[in-house]
A protein has these predicted regions:
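Phosphate-binding site recognition
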Residues: 1-320, 335, 339, 343
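Mg2+/Mn2+-dependent nuclease catalytic core
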Residues: 72-78, 376-393
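Active-site metal-binding core of divalent-cation-utilizing nuclease and nuclease-like domains
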Residues: 42-47, 336-366
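Feature representing long, continuous alpha-helical segments
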Residues: 322, 326, 330, 353-355, ...
């Protein structure tokens, strides 16, 4: 049945529920009652009956009628009448609401503050039930003869509590059809990405590009109003993208990131369709850096990293090796067409490699793997020596393609980068 229009949704819900309640409890006079919660209150007063209320997709009006303030106000008032305060606890035994967004905020407070919320920011005990856990995916891969490492690379990424959680639609589809593609976007609110990431908030575009390159970015989630219009800064945009599932969230580090290969491809498509001038120019410079790396042109690599740092990431203040790694991550953004997300701190023979870029399978015979070691106020030669001494290439012993060793150093006194590149000889 259909309410006919968004404006008629709340009156329609009240009318239908009152009619159904009258059929179930004809002995209770509901003729003067105007709301569903008023009817439940009358039934409780007369018969002592309590109700279980389940609302699926509670937030559909918040999302689909984002700019219709009148409809949203009517709906929020309906929910407040149904659930807020002590009166509803008399006639409601249990209320269970599902949706994408948390409960709408009025100013800084939840419109319904007597609910326990389980969200993509903090799933609590529901974490293992939001999607398939890694253990479940591993079992399914054995059952359906799929490569678990590939499934993990393409569809893992959501970290909820202690659980790695996979999108159930994507997992079921890959088990059934065996083709690594973006099953996810067909079921999500993909059209929401483009207007969101195109909003002109300070620092938003550079954060999006950093995450596309494989980095994590800090995000403050408290100011988000849990709707699709009340955005005040980049943190609100990043937070809604977390709730929509397009970003994952590390609750310990308070950082957002793109969870996996397939969602990263969605961001690339959205950014390209938006025709960001910043992205087009940045990608060109990043491509120059990648080409210089592949050509083993150490001087050009150092110059390009310097240029990218000055032009695009000047807000990152160089003060240690970690800040250098942040610049390096975004500098190699163009590599993401041919390489999987860079692996940070990969365990190796004796220690951890700073960055490892592994080509996608279709590019293994075209592009080399890159082992990158960073140094701060030392030398590029020291970085290369450490790669060899600590046997970092052993981490890629099953890799059959070419491997380049890349050492990068930043000299605090000269304010310059240095680079050295060698081909690994087994």
């Amino acid at each position: 049945m259909d309410a006919g229009s968004p404006e008629n949704t709340v009156p329609y819900i009240n009318k239908q529920l009152i009619a159904e309640l009258h059929l179930c409890y004809p002995e209770v006079d509901l003729q003067m009652v105007e709301t569903a919660y008023g009817a439940m209150s009358c039934i409780y007063a007369a018969l002592g009956k309590k109700f279980i209320v389940i609302i699926d997709e509670w937030d559909v009006l918040i999302r689909d009628e984002a700019t219709n303030q009148s409809v949203q106000n009517d709906y929020i008032q309906f929910l407040r009448g149904m659930f807020k305060g002590s009166e509803p606890t008399k006639f409601i035994r249990l209320a269970y609401l599902t949706g994408i967004l948390p409960i709408k905020k009025i100013k800084t407070q939840s419109a319904l503050n007597n609910f326990d919320e389980f969200t993509m920011l903090d799933a609590k005990i529901f974490a293992p039930y939001i999607g398939f856990t890694e253990t479940e995916v591993r079992t399914l891969c054995q059952q359906y003869h799929r490569d678990f490492d590939e499934v993990k690379r393409w569809y893992d990424g959501y970290l909820l509590g202690e659980y790695h959680v996979y999108n159930p639609k994507a997992v079921v589809s890959i088990m059934m059809w065996g083709d690594f593609q973006s099953y996810w976007s067909n079921t999500g609110t993909y059209e929401a990405i483009r207007p969101l990431i195109n909003m002109n908030f300070d620092g938003l575009k550079i954060d999006i590009m950093a995450m596309m390159a494989g980095d994590k970015v800090k995000v403050r989630t408290k100011s988000y109003q849990n709707d699709m219009v009340s955005f005040k800064n980049k943190n609100d945009i990043l937070t809604v993208l977390i709730h929509l599932g397009y970003l994952a969230y590390d609750c310990k580090m308070k950082m957002a990131y793109i969870p996996n290969e397939k969602i990263r491809s969605e961001f690339v498509e959205a950014v390209e369709e938006n025709h960001w001038d910043e992205f087009i120019e940045f990608e060109r410079k990043s491509r120059d850096l990648l080409n210089a790396t592949l050509d083993m042109d150490s001087t050009a690599v150092a110059e390009n990293i310097e240029k990218i740092h000055m032009d695009y990431t000047s807000m990152i203040q160089y003060n240690d090796e970690n800040s250098l790694s942040s610049v390096l991550t975004i500098a190699y953004l163009s590599a993401m067409k041919y390489y999987f997300k860079p692996i940070r701190e990969l365990p190796t023979g004796r220690g951890f490699a700073d960055f490892v870029f592994v080509p996608k399978h279709e590019y293994v015979n075209i592009y080399p793997a890159l082992l990158v070691e960073l140094k701060w106020n030392q030398s590029a030669e020291t970085a290369i020596a450490q790669i060899k001494e600590r046997k970092y290439p052993s981490a890629l012993e099953s890799y059959t393609g070419k491997i380049l060793l890349v050492g990068i150093n930043y000299d605090v006194k000269t304010k310059e980068h240095q680079c050295r590149i060698e081909e690994y000889q087994c």
